Design a protein with these regions (language model features):
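P-loop NTPase nucleotide-binding core
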Residues: 35-164, 184-187
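Conserved catalytic/switch belt of AAA+ P-loop NTPases
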Residues: 161-182
């Protein structure tokens, strides 16, 4: 008996995305066509088991392959904070360094008294818009950030309004640079 390769499991990518190619092509074309391309802003809807999460995963895979940064999240409490954290991760900074005397007898012994301590870098709380704009500065011309937000129907309207507003302003900020659309650092959202 041959096993069915299609196992409808939450988020599991099937071996074939039947009937989805036009949507995938629209998204891919949106990434390629530069700022303002309609395929860059999508809302995937459907009943439970339709494959919405799979489509978002496919968009993320496609964007990554084309050199875009991808932030994939689920619309739940703290959505905007998690996006800011993903875009502007905190690193470590040198908190203090103490270089003390060093003693060495070649071939016999050596000693050094010194220490360094590190702490998480202190970072001002970034707004979502600031975090996106800062990250875009690091992206290659014509590339940008793809946001895939799963379970958007269950999101707090406040989170979705905050995200939509930030994206709208970032797109406008890019327009104010007088850079050709094909070279602008863009945003895509699904």
């Amino acid at each position: 008996m041959t096993q069915n390769p299609f196992k409808p499991t939450a988020g599991k990518i099937p071996p074939l995305l039947i009937g989805r190619q036009p949507i995938i092509d629209d998204f891919a074309e949106g990434l390629e066509n530069g700022a303002g391309a309609p395929g860059r802003l999508m809302l995937i809807t459907g009943q439970r088991g339709y494959g919405k999460t799979v489509m978002l995963s496919e968009f993320a895979r496609l964007a990554t392959a084309q050199g875009w940064t991808v932030v994939s999240e689920t619309a739940s409490f703290g959505l905007c904070d998690r996006i800011v954290a993903a875009l502007a991760p905190q690193g470590l900074k040198l908190k203090s360094a103490n270089i003390g005397p060093s003693f060495s007898i070649p071939g016999i012994a050596s000693a050094s008294l010194g220490a360094a301590s590190f702490a998480p870098s202190e970072q001002c709380a970034l707004t979502l818009r600031e975090a996106i704009n800062q990250r875009l500065k690091k992206e290659a011309p014509g590339k940008g950030i793809v946001f895939t937000i799963d379970e958007a129907q269950a999101a707090s309207p406040d989170y979705m309004v905050a995200l939509a507003t930030a994206l709208q302003h970032v797109i406008r900020d890019q327009d104010l640079t007088n850079t050709p659309d094909s070279e602008k650092k863009g945003i895509a959202f699904a």
